[in-house]
Protein backbone atom coordinates (compact mmCIF):
# COMPACT_ATOMS: atom_id res chain seq x y z
CA UNK A 1 0.00 0.00 0.00
CA UNK A 2 2.82 2.40 0.80
CA UNK A 3 4.36 2.26 -2.68
CA UNK A 4 1.02 2.68 -4.44
CA UNK A 5 0.02 5.66 -2.32
CA UNK A 6 3.46 7.25 -2.51
CA UNK A 7 3.79 7.05 -6.29
CA UNK A 8 0.22 8.17 -6.96
CA UNK A 9 0.67 11.15 -4.64
CA UNK A 10 4.00 11.91 -6.31
CA UNK A 11 2.54 11.89 -9.82
CA UNK A 12 -0.45 13.99 -8.72
CA UNK A 13 1.95 16.48 -7.17
CA UNK A 14 3.95 16.73 -10.41
CA UNK A 15 0.78 17.30 -12.43
CA UNK A 16 -0.41 20.00 -10.02
CA UNK A 17 2.94 21.80 -9.97
CA UNK A 18 3.15 21.66 -13.77
CA UNK A 19 -0.35 23.09 -14.18
CA UNK A 20 0.25 25.91 -11.73
CA UNK A 21 3.68 26.83 -13.07
CA UNK A 22 1.94 27.20 -16.40
CA UNK A 23 -0.68 29.49 -14.83
CA UNK A 24 2.06 31.62 -13.28
CA UNK A 25 3.97 31.93 -16.57
CA UNK A 26 0.76 32.87 -18.38
CA UNK A 27 0.13 35.57 -15.79
CA UNK A 28 3.64 37.00 -16.22
CA UNK A 29 3.13 37.15 -19.98
CA UNK A 30 -0.33 38.70 -19.73
CA UNK A 31 0.80 41.42 -17.32
CA UNK A 32 4.05 42.21 -19.11
CA UNK A 33 6.10 41.19 -16.08
CA UNK A 34 7.85 38.32 -17.87
CA UNK A 35 10.52 40.59 -19.34
CA UNK A 36 11.65 41.67 -15.87
CA UNK A 37 11.17 38.45 -13.88
CA UNK A 38 13.64 35.66 -13.19
CA UNK A 39 11.88 32.28 -13.09
CA UNK A 40 13.70 29.35 -11.48
CA UNK A 41 12.18 25.86 -11.50
CA UNK A 42 13.91 23.49 -9.12
CA UNK A 43 13.51 20.86 -6.42
CA UNK A 44 15.36 19.75 -3.30
CA UNK A 45 16.29 16.34 -4.74
CA UNK A 46 15.51 13.83 -7.45
CA UNK A 47 13.35 10.72 -7.07
CA UNK A 48 13.43 6.98 -7.79
CA UNK A 49 10.66 5.38 -9.80
CA UNK A 50 11.89 1.81 -9.44
CA UNK A 51 15.53 2.36 -10.40
CA UNK A 52 17.86 0.23 -8.25
CA UNK A 53 14.70 -1.43 -6.92
CA UNK A 54 13.85 1.71 -4.99
CA UNK A 55 11.37 4.55 -4.69
CA UNK A 56 11.65 7.77 -2.68
CA UNK A 57 15.13 9.37 -2.47
CA UNK A 58 18.01 9.18 0.12
CA UNK A 59 20.58 7.13 -1.83
CA UNK A 60 23.55 8.80 -3.52
CA UNK A 61 22.73 7.33 -6.93
CA UNK A 62 22.06 9.72 -9.82
CA UNK A 63 18.28 9.50 -9.89
CA UNK A 64 17.96 11.26 -6.53
CA UNK A 65 21.32 13.03 -6.31
CA UNK A 66 20.63 15.08 -9.42
CA UNK A 67 18.13 17.89 -8.96
CA UNK A 68 15.93 19.66 -11.55
CA UNK A 69 17.16 23.21 -12.18
CA UNK A 70 15.80 25.36 -15.00
CA UNK A 71 16.25 29.12 -15.28
CA UNK A 72 14.46 31.72 -17.40
CA UNK A 73 16.20 35.09 -17.15
CA UNK A 74 15.32 37.31 -20.11
CA UNK A 75 18.26 39.17 -21.58
CA UNK A 76 20.78 37.43 -19.32
CA UNK A 77 20.65 33.64 -19.61
CA UNK A 78 20.74 32.48 -23.22
CA UNK A 79 17.71 30.30 -24.04
CA UNK A 80 18.54 26.63 -24.63
CA UNK A 81 21.81 26.80 -22.70
CA UNK A 82 22.91 23.59 -20.96
CA UNK A 83 25.53 23.90 -18.24
CA UNK A 84 27.24 20.94 -16.55
CA UNK A 85 28.91 22.79 -13.68
CA UNK A 86 28.30 21.32 -10.22
CA UNK A 87 25.78 23.49 -8.38
CA UNK A 88 23.77 22.93 -5.21
CA UNK A 89 20.71 24.29 -3.39
CA UNK A 90 23.13 25.92 -0.93
CA UNK A 91 23.93 28.33 -3.78
CA UNK A 92 20.36 29.62 -4.05
CA UNK A 93 20.43 32.18 -1.24
CA UNK A 94 23.53 33.94 -2.59
CA UNK A 95 22.07 33.84 -6.09
CA UNK A 96 18.73 35.37 -5.13
CA UNK A 97 20.40 38.10 -3.10
CA UNK A 98 22.70 39.09 -5.97
CA UNK A 99 19.87 39.03 -8.51
CA UNK A 100 17.87 41.32 -6.21
CA UNK A 101 20.82 43.68 -5.82
CA UNK A 102 21.19 42.92 -2.12
CA UNK A 103 24.45 42.40 -0.26
CA UNK A 104 25.62 38.79 0.04
CA UNK A 105 27.02 38.07 3.54
CA UNK A 106 30.62 36.87 3.59
CA UNK A 107 29.80 33.95 5.89
CA UNK A 108 26.90 32.54 3.88
CA UNK A 109 27.14 28.97 2.63
CA UNK A 110 27.21 28.43 -1.11
CA UNK A 111 28.12 30.80 -3.94
CA UNK A 112 26.10 32.93 -6.29
CA UNK A 113 25.20 31.30 -9.59
CA UNK A 114 24.86 34.64 -11.36
CA UNK A 115 28.24 34.37 -13.18
CA UNK A 116 27.29 30.89 -14.41
CA UNK A 117 23.84 32.07 -15.49
CA UNK A 118 25.60 34.79 -17.49
CA UNK A 119 27.79 32.17 -19.16
CA UNK A 120 30.97 32.99 -17.22
CA UNK A 121 31.83 30.14 -14.86
CA UNK A 122 34.48 31.26 -12.31
CA UNK A 123 37.81 29.47 -12.74
CA UNK A 124 37.76 28.40 -9.09
CA UNK A 125 34.25 26.92 -9.20
CA UNK A 126 33.76 23.60 -7.37
CA UNK A 127 34.64 20.46 -9.30
CA UNK A 128 33.39 17.85 -6.81
CA UNK A 129 30.35 17.31 -4.62
CA UNK A 130 30.05 15.54 -1.25
CA UNK A 131 26.95 13.63 -0.10
CA UNK A 132 26.20 12.00 3.26
CA UNK A 133 23.20 10.01 4.53
CA UNK A 134 23.18 8.75 8.12
CA UNK A 135 19.53 8.18 9.12
CA UNK A 136 19.89 4.47 9.88
CA UNK A 137 18.32 2.63 11.53
CA UNK A 138 15.06 4.21 10.56
CA UNK A 139 11.90 3.03 8.90
CA UNK A 140 13.23 3.88 5.43
CA UNK A 141 15.98 1.33 6.14
CA UNK A 142 18.54 3.12 3.95
CA UNK A 143 22.07 2.26 5.01
CA UNK A 144 24.47 4.95 6.17
CA UNK A 145 26.73 6.04 3.36
CA UNK A 146 28.71 8.97 2.04
CA UNK A 147 30.53 9.69 -1.17
CA UNK A 148 31.96 12.16 -3.62
CA UNK A 149 31.53 12.74 -7.35
CA UNK A 150 33.32 14.85 -9.92
CA UNK A 151 30.58 14.40 -12.49
CA UNK A 152 32.40 11.61 -14.35
CA UNK A 153 33.19 9.24 -11.48
CA UNK A 154 31.48 8.56 -8.16
CA UNK A 155 33.01 6.95 -5.06
CA UNK A 156 30.70 5.67 -2.31
CA UNK A 157 31.32 4.14 1.10
CA UNK A 158 28.63 2.22 3.01
CA UNK A 159 29.42 1.94 6.70
CA UNK A 160 28.10 1.03 10.15
CA UNK A 161 26.84 -0.75 12.03
CA UNK A 162 27.86 -3.97 10.31
CA UNK A 163 29.06 -3.01 6.82
CA UNK A 164 32.16 -1.46 5.29
CA UNK A 165 31.73 -1.57 1.54
CA UNK A 166 32.97 0.67 -1.27
CA UNK A 167 31.52 1.31 -4.72
CA UNK A 168 33.01 3.20 -7.67
CA UNK A 169 31.12 4.08 -10.83
CA UNK A 170 32.19 5.43 -14.20
CA UNK A 171 29.19 7.57 -15.08
CA UNK A 172 30.21 7.88 -18.72
CA UNK A 173 30.31 4.16 -19.47
CA UNK A 174 27.75 3.19 -16.81
CA UNK A 175 25.32 6.12 -16.36
CA UNK A 176 22.77 3.97 -14.53
CA UNK A 177 25.37 2.79 -11.99
CA UNK A 178 24.73 -0.91 -12.44
CA UNK A 179 28.30 -2.23 -12.15
CA UNK A 180 30.79 -1.02 -9.55
CA UNK A 181 34.39 -0.89 -10.77
CA UNK A 182 35.86 -0.46 -7.29
CA UNK A 183 39.10 -2.41 -6.95
CA UNK A 184 39.73 -2.79 -10.69
CA UNK A 185 43.33 -2.04 -11.59
CA UNK A 186 42.49 0.25 -14.51
CA UNK A 187 40.66 2.57 -12.10
CA UNK A 188 43.32 2.55 -9.37
CA UNK A 189 44.45 6.14 -9.88
CA UNK A 190 40.86 7.42 -10.12
CA UNK A 191 39.94 5.52 -6.97
CA UNK A 192 42.91 6.88 -5.03
CA UNK A 193 42.25 10.43 -6.19
CA UNK A 194 38.60 10.31 -5.18
CA UNK A 195 39.46 8.88 -1.76
CA UNK A 196 41.85 11.76 -1.25
CA UNK A 197 39.17 14.24 -2.31
CA UNK A 198 36.60 12.52 -0.10
CA UNK A 199 38.82 12.93 2.94
CA UNK A 200 39.50 16.56 2.02
CA UNK A 201 35.80 17.31 1.73
CA UNK A 202 35.09 15.74 5.10
CA UNK A 203 37.79 17.87 6.71
CA UNK A 204 36.60 21.09 5.07
CA UNK A 205 32.98 20.39 5.98
CA UNK A 206 34.01 19.38 9.50
CA UNK A 207 32.09 16.12 9.33
CA UNK A 208 32.06 14.58 12.84
CA UNK A 209 33.61 11.15 13.26
CA UNK A 210 30.46 9.88 14.98
CA UNK A 211 27.05 10.36 13.38
CA UNK A 212 24.21 12.06 15.26
CA UNK A 213 21.24 9.86 16.27
CA UNK A 214 18.98 8.92 13.38
CA UNK A 215 16.30 11.59 13.05
CA UNK A 216 13.55 9.29 11.78
CA UNK A 217 13.49 6.84 14.67
CA UNK A 218 15.67 3.79 14.96
CA UNK A 219 15.25 0.07 14.96
CA UNK A 220 12.45 -2.30 15.91
CA UNK A 221 11.82 -0.59 19.26
CA UNK A 222 11.36 2.88 17.81
CA UNK A 223 7.84 4.29 18.37
CA UNK A 224 7.92 5.65 14.82
CA UNK A 225 8.83 2.28 13.32
CA UNK A 226 6.29 0.47 15.51
CA UNK A 227 3.41 2.61 14.24
CA UNK A 228 4.36 1.91 10.65
CA UNK A 229 4.66 -1.84 11.18
CA UNK A 230 1.33 -2.00 12.98
CA UNK A 231 -0.35 -0.22 10.10
CA UNK A 232 -1.47 2.75 12.16
CA UNK A 233 -0.44 5.16 9.41
CA UNK A 234 -2.19 3.34 6.60
CA UNK A 235 -4.68 5.45 4.64
CA UNK A 236 -8.37 4.86 5.26
CA UNK A 237 -10.23 3.21 2.44
Question: What does each of the following model-derived ranges do?
Answer:
Residues 1-37:
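A long, amphipathic alpha-helix that forms part
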Residues 14-17, 21, 38-43, 69-71, ...:
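Beta-strand elements within well-structured catalytic alpha/beta cores of enzymes
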Residues 1-5, 13, 17, 181-237:
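Long, internal low-complexity/basic segments
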Residues 1-12, 56, 76-87, 99-104, ...:
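Active-site rim elements
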Residues 19-22, 26, 94, 98, ...:
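Solvent-exposed, polar/charged alpha-helical surfaces in well-ordered, non-transmembrane soluble domains
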Residues 45-51, 90-93, 98-167, 171, ...:
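C-terminal cap/loop subdomain of S1 sulfatases and analogous C-terminal strand-loop tails that border
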Residues 26-81, 88, 139:
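Histidine-centered active-site microenvironments of extracellular/periplasmic hydrolases
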Amino acid sequence: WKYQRYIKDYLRCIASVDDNVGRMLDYLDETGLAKNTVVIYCSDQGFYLGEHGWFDKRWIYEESLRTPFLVHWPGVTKPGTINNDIVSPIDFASTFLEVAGAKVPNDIQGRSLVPILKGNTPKNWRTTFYYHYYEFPGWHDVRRHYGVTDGRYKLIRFYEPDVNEWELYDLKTDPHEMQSVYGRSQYASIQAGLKKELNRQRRVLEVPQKDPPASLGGGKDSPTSAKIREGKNKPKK
